[in-house]
Amino acid sequence: IFENVEDLITGADVVVSCVTVAHGQFASDTCFKSGVLVVPVHTRGFQNCDLFFDQIFADDVAHVEGFKYFNQFKQFDEFARILLKQNPGRTSDQERILAYNIGIALHDIYFASQVYDKVKDSLPDISSDKLSEKFWV
């Protein structure tokens, strides 16, 4: 448990944020180490990253072209172009990548799969019984 957001982000390999409101930046530029992947689902709190991250991806141009720093992105592309193999995505372990997830499930499924594949061998074995009955939450 972290009391300070900068402490949480500093040194992280992956940062996923799902906040709907942010009143400023979550962390200073120096908190984002080389090689970090930042996935802000609702795009709040990471605008400073727009100016120094190596690659920025989003669902589509229309979702982000109105962002304050859009014209200053170092390198931008639509996320689907990675899946279509028209863009290689990460080309080095040092690249800082920002992937704005505006609202299509493509991001969610892809990133969950990639993160899981990276850590699955270090996870403890957990057995779970499949639910066979419908339920309401």
Question: What is the meaning of each model-derived region?
Answer:
Residues 45, 49-137:
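Adenosine-phosphate binding glycine-rich loop
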Residues 2-71:
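Rossmann-like adenosine-cofactor binding region
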Residues 1, 30-31, 99, 116:
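Broad hydrophobic/π-residue packing in well-ordered secondary structure
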